Amino acid sequence: MPAGHGVRARTRDLFARPFRKKGYIPLSTYLRTFKVGDYVDVKVNGAIHKGMPHKFYHGRTGRIWNVTKRAVGVEVNKQIGNRIIRKRIHVRVEHVQQSRCAEEFKLRKKKNDELKAAAKANGETISTKRQPKGPKPGFMVEGMTLETVTPIPYDVVNDLKGGY
């Protein structure tokens, strides 16, 4: 018989709960606040069947475009053929978590604002552009003696006899 093509086909391991994370859902899952524009990771919780997204969206990062009482609307990119479409899906809060994709950007932005404020107080202009890492500085290897290595000539006749 042919394999089924159901909504949850081939998700035995994909939707399995992690080791020592089975059982009740912590209350903090429901007490988190989501705002429009936040980045979230779609991470399906196999224990809750309501509001579960399709397996394609598991592990995807999207942006919240709608917030309802029990669910959030997430806008996720999906490649279809040769184009990328922004798909809008509604997912229950149990299946999403705050993404850390913009964490580094927010820290850099905060640091740059502090640097700009300090530079403005001193009356100077600074560049907040990131510079690529340059080559490593050179160093001298000390305490080593040079040893000249010469190749040993290969003797075909002796090698066939089994000797050196």
Curated annotation (Swiss-Prot):
GO molecular function, one term: structural constituent of ribosome
UniProt-listed PROSITE patterns: RIBOSOMAL_L21E
Listed InterPro entries: Ribosomal_eL21, Ribosomal_eL21_CS, Ribosomal_eL21_sf, Translation_prot_SH3-like_sf
Keywords, in A-Z order: Ribonucleoprotein, Ribosomal protein
Record bears the keyword Ribonucleoprotein: yes
Gene Ontology CC entries for this record: cytosolic large ribosomal subunit; cytosolic ribosome; extracellular region; nucleolus
Gene3D superfamilies associated with the record: 6.10.250.3260, Ribosomal protein L21
One Pfam family of this chain: Ribosomal_L21e
Keyword Ribosomal protein set for record: yes
GO biological process, any: translation
Record-linked PANTHER family: 60S RIBOSOMAL PROTEIN L21
Family, as annotated: Belongs to the eukaryotic ribosomal protein eL21 family.
Protein name: Large ribosomal subunit protein eL21z/eL21y
Source organism (scientific name): Arabidopsis thaliana
